[in-house]
Design a protein with these regions (language model features):
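Amphipathic protein-protein interaction modules
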Residues: 45-113
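Long, contiguous N-terminal structural blocks used for assembly/anchoring
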Residues: 1-63
Length: 117
């Protein structure tokens, strides 16, 4: 698994599934380049830890790095899709439980125009 690929798709999914105060999705206006450095570093740290802690289950799942990043964001934040609904059985359940350990993250636009979470 390539951390940077997982992280990239995690960030894309985060922007896609998060909204501004007016309800517009963040990805309609912002890209991963707009994520504040400290928020991106936190995302990187969470993704790296998740990959390391769940390497065996992730390998067995057969999911691509892109899917892992996407599903990690959706699952940890309790969205209506994620590891649990891919038909992975016990592996999906284990990855879902592991994702929940990281808690939810809420993104917002700071006064400086960067995305924080």
């Amino acid at each position: 698994m390539k951390l940077e690929t997982v992280l990239h798709h995690y960030a894309i999914c985060a922007l896609w599934s998060s909204t501004q105060d007016d309800g517009e999705p963040l990805d309609a206006v912002y890209t991963s380049d707009d994520i504040a450095p400290e928020t991106l570093e936190s995302m990187r740290s969470d993704c790296a830890d998740f990959i390391e802690s769940n390497a065996e289950a992730l390998e067995e799942s057969g999911l691509s790095d892109e899917q892992i990043g996407h599903d990690f964001w959706l699952t940890r934040n309790g969205h209506g899709a994620g590891f649990w609904d891919r038909g992975l059985g016990e592996i999906g359940e284990a990855l879902t439980k592991a994702s929940k350990h990281y808690g939810e993250v809420y993104l917002y636009v700071g006064d400086d125009g960067y995305i924080y979470g």
